[in-house]
Curated annotation (Swiss-Prot):
UniProt organism field: Methylobacterium radiotolerans (strain ATCC 27329 / DSM 1819 / JCM 2831 / NBRC 15690 / NCIMB 10815 / 0-1)
Keywords attached to this entry: 4Fe-4S, ATP-binding, Bacteriochlorophyll biosynthesis, Chlorophyll biosynthesis, Iron, Iron-sulfur, Magnesium, Metal-binding, Nucleotide-binding, Oxidoreductase, Photosynthesis
Protein origin, superkingdom: Bacteria
The protein's name in its UniProt record: Light-independent protochlorophyllide reductase iron-sulfur ATP-binding protein
UniProt subunit comment: Homodimer. Protochlorophyllide reductase is composed of three subunits; BchL, BchN and BchB.
Residues annotated as binding ATP: G41, I42, G43, K44, S45, T46, K70, N211, R212, P235, D236, L237
Gene symbol of the encoding locus: bchL
Length: 297
């Protein structure tokens, strides 16, 4: 069977961008699916990769899908920049039946399977369309049938119809944030996007992961106000920076009391999510209300 690479809009000019038409029938039915969002640079790839390892250490079969054109979501798992789905398809002129699994799937640390969706050139195309084609390709090769957990690591805090497309496939959306104004402001916008998508899809907010923060007071105050909950807290430790430079997950770093506490927190988070995190019925604030709500030390 071929993947139908078709233009999802009725027309396209010489210059401009495609918009994605989401397919409500394209579902991942055999795995628990999590989509990880958050402000750009907040540590979503670090969080996603270490969470994937934690799931794998629970004995689960894990697939991580990077949804950023930079295709750097999984490098701490694979120790290299993995080939992207879009590059693999272009190499065979989009004849997907010519692709082998190893052309676009890389096995990473502790058996985590890694896929980088990639994306169109900057300023053209729709990244969400690429995500949809990635899921179709994985289904065509029956890879999702042998998977227990799928983790989507999603570009920045972009909540357009395209990069919101992983929400079509997800059971729970997780938001990574720090204890600062900009991160929480971005989180509120993501809450609004997920709230809108939940009207048409089964995705629900799973909760908040506090990252790179010594304290969580502002996060907790915001959560209480809108109806969110904090699932985990990871402080800003130098070992995290060093793990990225070593192209390694935290589970591969030399043991220390502070590192052991972090990996234990990842294991606890994975256990909580696998057991079934209750959805959060959060209501986002209006931007001006949030501006007045935050800060004022």
């Amino acid at each position: 069977m071929n993947i139908a690479i078709r233009n999802p809009v009725v027309a396209r000019k010489e210059e401009g961008s495609l918009q994605v038409a989401l397919d409500p029938d394209l579902k991942i039915e055999t795995a628990k699916v999590f989509a990880v969002y958050g402000k750009g640079g907040i540590g979503k790839s670090t969080t996603s990769s270490n969470l994937s390892v934690a799931f794998s250490k629970l004995g689960k079969r894990v697939l991580q899908i990077g949804c950023d054109p930079k295709h750097d979501s999984t490098f701490t798992l694979t120790k290299r920049l993995a080939p992207t789905v879009i590059d693999a398809l272009e190499a065979v002129n989009f004849h997907s039946e010519e692709l082998r699994v190893e052309d676009f799937v890389v096995e990473g640390y502790n058996g985590v399977m890694c896929v980088e969706a990639g994306g169109p050139p900057a300023g053209t195309g729709c990244g969400g369309y690429v995500v949809g084609q990635t899921v179709k390709l994985l289904k065509e090769h029956h890879l999702l049938e042998d998977t227990d957990v799928v983790v989507f690591d999603v570009l920045g805090d972009v909540v357009c119809g395209g990069f919101a497309s992983p929400l079509q496939h997800a059971d729970r959306a997780l938001i990574v944030t720090a204890n600062d104004f900009d991160s929480i402001f971005a989180m509120n916008r993501i809450v609004a996007a997920i709230h809108a998508k939940s009207k048409n899809y089964g995705v629900r907010l799973g909760g908040v992961i506090a990252n790179r923060s010594a304290k969580t007071d502002e996060i907790d105050r915001f959560n209480d106000a809108v109806g969110l909950k904090r699932l985990a807290h990871f402080p800003d430790l130098d070992v995290v920076r060093r793990s990225r430079l070593k192209k390694s997950t935290l589970f591969e770093m030399e043991s220390s009391p502070e590192l052991d506490a972090v990996t234990a927190e990842y294991m606890r988070l994975a256990e909580t999510l696998w057991a079934g995190a209750e959805p959060c019925e959060a209501q986002p604030m209006k931007d001006r209300d949030l501006f007045e709500f935050l800060g004022f030390d």
